[in-house]
């Protein structure tokens, strides 16, 4: 399942440059003076498509001592983004996309060590502001939320040397959602950003009540 999802996303990412329509220009917004009145912004960067590849550093917080710990799990973050300008008067954008995001965490040590992989298809919905610095560089703070559905994952108990399915065996709920905060930097077509997910949904079942995801992500990519 994991290989199928990653392969499908890679195919979409490779096909997107060919499908992208012109609509992204790499210059500072022009200012148009109207008579003797003030300045009026002219539309720029009306829409864009982007490819993203990065790394997650995730953890799970829980009222269960089995899950709650300081262990951070690293994983892949892969997907694409699409954005459109909301108003011609200011560089404010609405952005969404589709990502394959590997989350989870670790707890304990030695014979008491647990690791849990929680892999999701994730859809963010963000409001982004682009502040231009120079002609081709922009700083892009954003905030919003995300919804996700679990695709696969496993829980490994190193003490008993056993493994279970994270979602199919009744340990974790498949659905997750929360807040996403971050900031990106664009230079011409290149893009890099850092963000943090604050899980608001209780992803635990049965013994794992009151359990939430937390994830720090760094992405690099290109915009078309």
Which ranges hold each PLM region?
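Sec/Tat signal peptide C-region and signal peptidase I cleavage site
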Residues: 16-20
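Outer-membrane beta-barrel translocator domains and adjoining extracellular loop/strand segments
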Residues: 61-67, 106-112, 153-161, 204-209
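Short glycine/proline- and aromatic-enriched beta-strand/turn motifs that initiate or cap beta-hairpins
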Residues: 21-74
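Membrane-embedded beta-strands of outer-membrane beta-barrel proteins
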Residues: 51, 78-80, 98, 123-127, ...
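Outer-membrane beta-barrel transmembrane domain signature
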Residues: 86-92, 113-203, 224
């Amino acid at each position: 399942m994991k290989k199928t999802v990653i392969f499908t996303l890679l195919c979409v990412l490779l096909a997107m440059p060919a499908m992208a329509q012109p609509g992204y220009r790499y210059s500072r917004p022009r200012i148009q003076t109207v008579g003797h009145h003030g300045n009026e912004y002219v539309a720029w960067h009306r829409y864009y498509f982007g490819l993203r590849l990065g790394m997650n550093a995730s953890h799970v917080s829980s009222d269960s001592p089995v899950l709650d710990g300081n262990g951070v799990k690293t994983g892949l973050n892969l997907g694409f983004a699409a954005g459109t300008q909301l108003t011609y008067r200011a560089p404010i954008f609405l952005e969404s996309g589709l990502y394959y995001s590997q989350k989870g965490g670790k707890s304990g040590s030695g014979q008491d060590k647990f690791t849990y992989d929680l892999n999701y298809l994730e859809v963010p919905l963000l409001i982004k502001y682009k502040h231009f610095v120079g002609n081709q560089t922009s700083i892009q703070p954003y905030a919003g939320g995300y919804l996700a559905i679990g695709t696969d994952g496993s829980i490994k108990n190193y003490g008993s040397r056993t493994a279970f399915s994270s979602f199919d065996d009744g340990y974790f709920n498949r659905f997750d959602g929360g807040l996403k905060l971050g900031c990106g930097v664009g230079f011409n077509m290149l893009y890099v950003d850092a963000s943090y997910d604050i899980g608001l949904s209780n992803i635990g079942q049965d013994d794992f009540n009151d359990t939430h995801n937390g994830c720090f992500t760094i992405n690099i990519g290109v915009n078309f």
